[in-house]
């Protein structure tokens, strides 16, 4: 009996294969570029006889035995619901053909060519494949809604797929196949043993399980205070931490050395001033052109990894500006993605005749912990005044910006009522008055001007030169700790010179500069005419102090200044460590290259009585930066 059944099945096998081949030929008559309209697969399934339906559900090998059919890739959002119980082959094929109509949205990028759809996916049975298959296709643009079965309209583009991957027989299905998902699905699978495999995909497991972070993986370098660190204000403390002053971003101003907050853009306004604003843009230095847009990169250090070149201003400046930008953003609590108010264009609300405070100005100051962040010194230089203008007339010309006091060098001693050299200083009571003054100025060749009248001269343009607090400090190499034993004092620094420019000059001369700072008044935060430069190595430090004098050349600045070791007033004696002087701080420092140490009075006398050291001269700290009270009446 079994032999008869076997012979009948073998006789039917060629007929079934021939009918299946005819059905495939009908299905693939359309050219590869042709796309079938929806519903054509359902019509073909209904037109096929039951024997052909049987062929879709199973495949037979050469021995006539039933083998596992090729299952189609189970895609994201469609949980395959296996049929419970054992059904007939016809029932299995019927459920498979009807389930093919369950995909609601298929990627339109699928090639309609049937030859490209006969793919072997990683979870296919290798023994059931009949040809050499290329790498699997990934389909990622379908819906991610989970359903317990297949339903809806099936897209026309996977018609050829149904011819080669019919549904499996219930005998050979495993329980875990009920929830099989595509590896491209962003939803986690229902089982923990698949979650691990899903999370191993670097472009899926980590990114799709959570929203992308705009901050990336970058962490700004933290400044670690050490016993040898000191503050830019001249005190003793950590990196750039000083009393009454935040850490300065020593980045180069994107516009000019006078007004980094002003920006002019082309507009339709008619300029009636004597010195119109330069709408074509400011004449910036070549190595600061790409710092105008400070928020152009999310990751500050990833795109500028060039090596430092002490003589290449371009490569050095780009990297340094990024370092300072990131450190300043991390310390002030804001990100480069969200620029401060001074980054906005001046053309948004340009009013050259803005009066009084800067509340209505487009450059309104941001607030941090309820307090406004200061950007400028309250002391402003005014040059080119008319020779016959007196103090009252100067006050009247600038009183519209806020309460102020007019001062000039040796004013109290000279008893003069007129500025003797044609310049003066405006000391404003409120820092916002300085911003209002800047907004009212005209810009010409990178300088700010404001028209002032005297009894004999009408509307004479005078130069306005405010001091940006960010220009007080500049870190060239944040990876190096600040060592006061490798720091020099630079006296007679021109007041317009910024910290970044001082660092560039010293690094070009001696190399190894890691920090530069401009000494400022603790109350008004205006430059005092001195600076500090810290080196990262002893050789550069010794070379600088051995020179004694340095020629500072930058732009219009060309001045010879004195260089000395930077002396601290809180160091113990290097010889006795305070044992011979009762633990008092050492008052003397020997700047000779054979010593370079702090000494108490006893050790100085003992060491420098030796032959060859009797001519060494001690350096004494002239006094720290102590707040001073200015007694005058605001006008």
Swiss-Prot record:
InterPro entries: CEBP_ZZ, CEBP_ZZ_sf, CPEB, Nucleotide-bd_a/b_plait_sf, RBD_domain_sf, RRM_dom. GO terms for cellular component: cytoplasm; dendrite; dendritic spine; endoplasmic reticulum; growth cone; neuron projection; nucleus; perinuclear region of cytoplasm. Residues 341-353 have a biased composition (Basic and acidic residues). SUPFAM superfamilies: RNA-binding domain, RBD. Residues 166-182 have a biased composition (Basic residues). One of its GO terms (biological process) is cellular response to glucose starvation. Residues 378-469, 486-568 form the RRM domain. Keywords: Cell projection, Cytoplasm, Endoplasmic reticulum, Repeat, RNA-binding, Synapse. This is Cytoplasmic polyadenylation element-binding protein 4.
């Amino acid at each position: 009996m079994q032999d008869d059944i076997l012979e009948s099945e073998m006789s039917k096998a060629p007929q079934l294969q021939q009918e299946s081949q005819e059905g495939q030929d009908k299905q693939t008559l359309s050219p590869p570029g042709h796309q079938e309209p929806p519903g054509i697969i359902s019509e073909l399934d209904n037109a096929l006889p039951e024997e052909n339906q049987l062929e879709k559900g199973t495949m037979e090998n050469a021995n006539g035995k039933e083998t596992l059919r090729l299952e189609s890739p189970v895609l994201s959002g469609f949980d395959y619901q296996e049929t419970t119980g054992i059904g007939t082959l016809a029932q299995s094929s019927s459920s498979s053909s009807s389930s093919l109509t369950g995909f609601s949205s298929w990627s339109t990028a699928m090639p309609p060519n049937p030859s490209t759809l006969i793919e072997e996916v990683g979870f296919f049975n290798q023994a059931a494949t009949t040809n050499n298959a290329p790498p699997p296709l990934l389909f990622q643009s379908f819906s991610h809604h989970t359903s317990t079965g297949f339903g809806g309209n099936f897209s026309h583009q996977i018609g050829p797929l149904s011819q080669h991957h019919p549904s499996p027989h219930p005998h050979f299905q495993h329980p875990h196949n009920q929830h099989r998902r595509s590896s491209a699905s962003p939803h986690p699978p229902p089982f923990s043993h698949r979650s691990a495999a899903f999370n191993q995909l670097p472009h899926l497991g980590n990114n799709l399980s959570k929203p992308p972070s705009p901050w990336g993986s970058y962490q700004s370098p933290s400044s670690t205070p050490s016993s040898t660190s000191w503050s830019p204000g001249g005190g003793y403390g950590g990196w750039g931490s000083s009393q009454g002053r935040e850490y300065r971003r020593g980045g180069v101003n994107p516009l000019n050395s006078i007004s980094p907050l002003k920006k002019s853009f082309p507009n339709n306004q008619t300029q009636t001033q004597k010195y119109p604003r330069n709408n074509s843009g400011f004449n910036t230095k070549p190595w600061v052109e790409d710092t105008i847009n400070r928020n152009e990169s999310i990751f500050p250090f990833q795109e500028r990894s060039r090596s430092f070149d002490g003589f290449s201003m371009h490569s050095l400046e780009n990297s340094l500006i990024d370092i300072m930008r990131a450190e300043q953003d991390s310390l002030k609590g804001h990100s480069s993605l969200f620029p401060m108010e001074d980054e906005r264009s001046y053309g948004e609300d340009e009013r050259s005749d803005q009066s009084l405070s800067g509340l209505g100005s487009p450059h309104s100051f941001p607030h941090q912990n309820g307090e406004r962040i200061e950007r400028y010194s309250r002391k402003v230089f005014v040059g080119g005044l008319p020779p016959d203008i007196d103090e009252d007339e100067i006050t009247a010309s600038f009183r519209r910006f806020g309460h102020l006091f007019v001062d000039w060098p040796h004013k109290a001693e000279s008893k003069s009522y007129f500025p003797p050299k044609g310049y003066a200083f405006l000391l404003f009571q409120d820092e916002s008055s300085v911003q209002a003054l800047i907004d009212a100025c005209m810009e010409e060749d990178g300088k700010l001007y404001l028209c002032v009248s005297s009894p004999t001269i009408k509307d004479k343009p005078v130069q306005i030169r405010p001091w940006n607090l960010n220009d007080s400090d500049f870190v060239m190499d944040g990876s190096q700790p600040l060592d006061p034993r490798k720091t020099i004092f630079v006296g007679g620094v021109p007041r317009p010179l910024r910290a970044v420019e001082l660092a560039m000059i010293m690094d070009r001369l001696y190399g190894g500069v890691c920090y530069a700072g401009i000494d400022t008044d603790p109350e008004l935060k205006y430059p005092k005419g001195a600076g500090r430069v810290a080196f990262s190595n002893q050789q550069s430090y010794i070379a600088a102090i051995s020179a004694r004098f340095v020629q500072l050349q930058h732009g219009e600045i060309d001045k010879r200044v004195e260089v000395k070791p930077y002396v601290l007033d809180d160091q113990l004696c290097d010889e006795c460590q305070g044992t011979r002087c009762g633990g008092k701080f050492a008052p003397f420092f020997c700047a000779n290259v054979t010593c370079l140490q702090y000494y108490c009075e006893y050790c100085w006398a003992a060491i420098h009585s030796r032959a060859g050291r009797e001519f060494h001269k001690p350096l004494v700290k002239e006094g720290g930066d102590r707040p001073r009270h200015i007694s005058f009446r605001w006008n």
